[in-house]
Structures are given as structure tokens and as C-alpha cells.
């Protein structure tokens, strides 16, 4: 997911920001590993290296898939307003508590299926989807602001590719970034 974060926040921007990784405590299972860790609910957390180097500050961002809140806390330091949705109530509560303890005051967490996003706060300058959809949900594309960027894994369980989508000129420009492997996006609760 670090490459996802970088693709979202640093797409085409020369200025880079390096985060001190120690500011956001990693989940214990991730401590010396450069791979995703499984949460108690059976979901996965982003690999720790994913969010380290990112670029320009965005105003309003939607994260689909809060998980433990680790990546959310990193993103919160890089954006003005962060809205994040999680479909599993135990994970949402755990993340909300963690974010409160870390002093992340610019984050709102909601229990919701990821495929519908959070239209009440749209449009978003950036949308980061942390689970794979066979096709990008139209509801998420509709919530992207003009000039905004959405990064998501797209494909079936066997093969997925990380895509960056930019909204411009009344349409969308799609870019394939790399092959990835993510848990499936659940479109409804």
C-alpha cells in the first residue's frame, strides 16, 4: 500500500516528503517485516514501507478500508481532511480508538461498505482503495473531484493490477502501475 499512497499523493509531483516512520507505531506483527500483516479480523494491514515517501499535501481524501488504522494515521499527517470507511465494526472501533490516542483530529471514521464511499463529504482530491474490485465502483469515481486521483487494485482473485485514475476534461484517464495482490473489496455489508 505504500506504493498506492505514493501513487496517490506523489503522482507527477517533484517535491517529496519523507515521514519519520517511528511517529506512527506499527502493529506488532509488522515490526521488522516488509510485508502486510493480518489483523485479528482476518483482513490485512499495509506493508510498513508503503507510506514512507509521499508527496504534495491534498485537502480532502477518502480511504476505503481503514483496517487497523495504521495507514490512516500516516495519511492523516499528509492531508487536511481524511475520511475513511471500514466495513468491519471491530476494526472500525479499534482504528477509531488508535487514531484518537495518536491525536489524529483531521480523521473521520465510518462503518460502511467500501464500494459506496462516503458521498456526503465528496468531492475528494484523492481516493485510496485498499481492497481489490473486479471493476472500479462507479460511486467512487463519481466522488472524485476534477483533477483528483484515485488509486486502487483492480482485478479478480488470481491477478490484480494497481491503477491510478485521474479525473480530467470531463472524463477519466487510467494508468496501470504494477501487479499486486489484495483482499477483495466487499461492495455491501
Per-segment meaning from a language model:
Residues 50-168:
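Conserved nucleotide-cofactor-binding alpha/beta core module
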Residues 155-189:
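Active-site capping/gating segments
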Residues 1, 41-47, 52:
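Conserved Class I S-adenosyl-L-methionine-dependent methyltransferase catalytic core
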Residues 2, 23, 34-36, 81:
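Low-complexity intrinsically disordered segments
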Residues 11:
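Glycine-rich phosphate-binding loops of nucleotide-dependent enzymes
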Amino acid at each position: 500500500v505504500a506504493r498506492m499512497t505514493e501513487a496517490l499523493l506523489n503522482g507527477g509531483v517533484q517535491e517529496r516528503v519523507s515521514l519519520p516512520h517511528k511517529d506512527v507505531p506499527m502493529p506488532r506483527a509488522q515490526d521488522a517485516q516488509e510485508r502486510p500483516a493480518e489483523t485479528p479480523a482476518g483482513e490485512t494491514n499495509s506493508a510498513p514501507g508503503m507510506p514512507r515517501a509521499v508527496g504534495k499535501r491534498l485537502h480532502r481524501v477518502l480511504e476505503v478500508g481503514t483496517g487497523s488504522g495504521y495507514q490512516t494515521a500516516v495519511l492523516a499527517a499528509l492531508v487536511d481532511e481524511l475520511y475513511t470507511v471500514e466495513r468491519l465494526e471491530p476494526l472500525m472501533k479499534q482504528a477509531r480508538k488508535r487514531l484518537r490516542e495518536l491525536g489524529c483530529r483531521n480523521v473521520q471514521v465510518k462503518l460502511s461498505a467500501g464500494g459506496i464511499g462516503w458521498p456526503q463529504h465528496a468531492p475528494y482530491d484523492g481516493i485510496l482503495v485498499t481492497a481489490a474490485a473486479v471493476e472500479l465502483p462507479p460511486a467512487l469515481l463519481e466522488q472524485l473531484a476534477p483533477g483528483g486521483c484515485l488509486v486502487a487494485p483492480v482485478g479478480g482473485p488470481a491477478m490484480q493490477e494497481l491503477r491510478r485514475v485521474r479525473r480530467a476534461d470531463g472524463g477519466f484517464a487510467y494508468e496501470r502501475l504494477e501487479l499486486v495482490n489484495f483482499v477483495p473489496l466487499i461492495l455491501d455489508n
